[in-house]
């Protein structure tokens, strides 16, 4: 069985909307897009902590899972950037599963596979069909739906020292009992923590 791991950048007030760029996701009148970028550019150790930390604590690669919007934004950017970086290498090497309701979806990047239908059902089937970690990047609506269905097993949260005061929050109404698996603090004070979801 796959383990589903949500990897997110969050503010101190729990916002995860549009961390990378000003035009990434302006829905709801959000004007703080790109809020995480200055912190992570100034602290490369923090920018990769979710992945280096997971590797150091025995992560088992199984693939990546995206909502359709995040797939287009994230994969499109990181697979076209000309700057060498380890994240692009991880993306290229990983199978990429995309939850979508569009039966005619065309996915632009190699090793990309559509999960067509209702995400809770398609992801639940995928979860039962393999092993290793399925890492969800961003994809806030997908993560919240999966959490409500009890399908998220772990969260790796990189918490940045900023309060945004607006924007979509990662956790929205689903109570969770979490256990810290590991935590690391970068030189600039950015904290990355992996939490396991405790099941009843």
Task: Locate predicted features.
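Enzymes that bind and transform nitrogen-containing heteroaromatic metabolites
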Residues: 1-200
């Amino acid at each position: 069985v796959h383990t589903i791991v949500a990897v997110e950048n969050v503010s101190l007030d729990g916002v995860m909307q549009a961390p990378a760029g000003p035009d990434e996701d302006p829905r709801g009148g959000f004007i703080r897009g790109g809020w995480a970028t200055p912190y992570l550019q100034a602290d490369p150790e923090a920018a990769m902590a979710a992945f280096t930390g997971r590797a150091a604590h025995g992560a088992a690669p199984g693939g990546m899972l995206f909502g359709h919007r995040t797939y287009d934004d994230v994969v499109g950017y990181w697979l076209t950037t000309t700057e060498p970086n380890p994240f692009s290498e991880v993306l290229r090497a990983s199978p990429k599963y995309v939850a979508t309701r569009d039966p005619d979806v065309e996915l632009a990047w190699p090793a990309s596979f559509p999960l067509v239908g209702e995400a809770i059902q398609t992801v639940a089937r995928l979860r039962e069909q393999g092993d290793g970690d399925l890492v969800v990047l961003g994809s806030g609506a997908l993560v919240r739906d999966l959490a409500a269905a009890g399908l998220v097993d772990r969260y790796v949260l990189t918490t940045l020292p900023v309060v945004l005061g607006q924007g979509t929050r990662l956790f929205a109404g689903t109570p969770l009992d979490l256990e810290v698996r590991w935590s690391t603090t970068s030189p600039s004070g950015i904290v990355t923590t992996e939490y396991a979801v405790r099941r009843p």
